[in-house]
Amino acid sequence: MNTRIPTAIAAVLLVLAVAANAYDKQLDTHVIHEAYILGQRNDKSTGDFLANYLSQITEPQNDIHIAQIELLTPYAQIVDVSRQKSADGYKEDQAIQDYKTHGNTVKVNVSLMLPSAYPKSAESKEVPTPAPATGPEKSAIRPENFWQNFQFNLKQNGKTIPSRGISNQPIHSTATNTAPAVLTGENVWLEYDVKDVASELTNVEVVTPQGKVIKATFDLKKLR
């Protein structure tokens, strides 16, 4: 019996160690409350937390720019939604209901920005900008489905994880008295089942139409 007790304790410690190095896949009401409050604060602590789930892409790119890649665990999703709706009277009961509705998922967001919306270098600023196109010519420049020419992959240990769904949200400029709103980019969302996403190094790869691979790496052992 004396030899079995240490073995049992070691087994418990091992389970605790694994749990401590794994993102939260299933959230109870206590954890949802914690995430909700962090989002509602919408302060530096909220920003510092969510910064771990975002990768700004600084690698030089031609044409369409992959501006940033975001990976959100179930916990981070609640924080992010609560933050976005902190001024809209978003209630904790709604956060709980939203979690039950959307289930346990890992979400990836890729922001694609058109060249006209991306900051220009000093050299490019010296080149005269062509006059804006109008009519049929304008609509032919960049259709809203341009993002479909890109490939999006979530990989662990070199293996591609199948997505459960993909959606997009166009990004438009703000209309003014002298200029209408125009398409400036696209947010592409991919959804994955937490059962398929392990707590380990995870790569989000975006393949451009020209075959260039842009990658962001997240260590899910260090995320909630």
Functional labels for PLM-detected ranges:
Residues 22-224:
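Conserved functional micro-motifs across diverse proteins
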Residues 17-19:
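N-terminal signal peptide c-region/cleavage motif recognized by signal peptidases
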